[in-house]
């Protein structure tokens, strides 16, 4: 989305979300640009809380010098994760990115997240890729030479666990 909608990224994201909801739920809902209202309507209709996943949440911040655009984007994220409405429908928010959670003025826009980094990941280290034991099992299952795989991917050590994360 970023490459084609740099100036209006928030509107482009909202349009994509609305398109996905239309595909899933049909035309019976009010598809205004108020995403929280739409998600809340779907929640009330289905009684199923939402899990919102955003990969590379910090893309706009890393790629734009436009402070107004960054502010607009952070306000959008704030509305998804910290608004009164979102408290009703949000079961979980999961975001990935390079930058730590961005602050707006003195208040954190997304301070209700637990941050895990590659350096401080203890509870979720084993989910960053494949553990060495898992790679050994996969090599055995698919008749691959573990030493060759290890030499090719090398892996990395996090919290004392040797991990592999091939692309």
Residue locations for each model-derived region?
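Phosphate-binding site recognition
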Residues: 1-167
